[in-house]
Regions:
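N-terminal intrinsically disordered, cationic/polar leader segments
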Residues: 1-307
Length: 307
């Protein structure tokens, strides 16, 4: 039967990749997915050859700084197209990488694991790549906090406090709400060389507060208070990720791509909440400039298929 396939390949291939950052090497575990497009004349692909081709591509590419996982994805995609005689290849890589952090008050050194993400697509004539990160934080719910504020104001009024004093008290005292651990993901599709830790900062700062593996009591107090002074909806985090990315990288071209995604894990519900935004830089800039709805939200798959 002569019928082309949209994709055929392998998923979940585990490889150890040596990466350099800050003058030291780190051996990290990477998970690789790879697919190729098949034209009607091709019966199939050599599935068993994919891991071998990954090894060849990794050996050929000297990985420099930590975020170059996207360059590796692009190199593998090109290698697969050439060696498998495919029309097109798409590669996705996810690697867990340790970064050093200092806690906000005591300065305690702590190691946090973040996900470095690389996506690339290659045809016989061109290629595109995205660099991404995934990081966790905490979001304090603004809605519940508003309810607590209203009730606190009512009780203070019943206790005889003047309105001006009530407002002052509510400004000074952190207000309770329910918290959500959040996972933010940010992808940028560009030829620019970006620093992955800068992307992690953008993701973490879009939430109410970063979180840390180790915390002394003064640090714990700071994180909790800071989060409750910066309540965020899941939608707020996505909008902040997009805006911060465009502000930080003004040299992005209009045809470059941004995708931001936030998942908050609920504590008082049995469901979780999600928001995301994707599109070309030009689409996002235009919408932020005029405040009107953009009729086009270019999706990741469409952006990758432009090659």
């Amino acid at each position: 039967m002569q019928l082309g396939l949209s994709r055929a390949g392998v998923t979940g291939v585990q490889k150890a990749v040596r990466m350099q950052h800050g003058g030291s090497d780190a051996l990290v575990s990477a998970e690789i997915d790879c697919f190729v497009d098949l034209d009607p004349a091709q019966k199939g692909v050599h599935m068993s050859r994919f891991p071998e081709l990954f090894e060849e591509a990794i050996d050929e590419l000297v990985i420099g700084e930590m975020l170059l996982v996207e360059r590796l994805a692009e190199h593998i995609a090109r290698h697969i197209v050439a060696r498998q005689d495919a029309l097109r290849a798409e590669v996705r890589i996810a690697a867990r990488y340790p970064i050093e952090r200092s806690t906000p008050v005591t300065g305690l050194r702590t190691q946090e694991l973040v996900s470095l993400l690389g996506i690339a697509a290659a045809s016989r004539t061109a290629s595109r790549r995205l660099v991404g990160v995934e990081a966790t934080g905490i979001n304090a719910c603004p809605c519940a906090q508003g309810l607590v504020r209203d009730q606190a104001a009512e009780r203070l009024g019943e206790a005889g406090f003047a309105d001006v004093d009530i407002e002052r008290i509510l400004e000074l005292v952190p207000l309770a709400t329910h918290n959500q651990r959040g996972r933010g993901t940010l992808y940028l599709g560009t030829e620019l060389r970006l620093d992955a830790e800068d992307l992690v900062d953008i993701v973490e700062q879009s939430m109410s507060s970063p979180i840390y593996e180790l915390l002394k009591r003064p640090d714990e107090l700071f994180v909790v208070e800071h989060a409750h002074l910066s309540p965020r909806f899941v939608e707020d985090s996505v909008r902040l990720m997009v805006k911060s990315s465009l502000d930080a990288y003004g040299e992005l071209r209009d045809e470059d791509f941004v995708m931001a995604r936030q998942v908050n894990f609920e504590t008082i519900h049995n469901h979780d909440v999600l928001a995301e935004r994707f599109g070309t830089v030009g689409e996002l800039r235009a919408e932020l400039a005029n405040g009107g709805h953009s009729p086009t939200h270019t999706e990741l798959g469409d952006w990758l298929r432009a090659v």
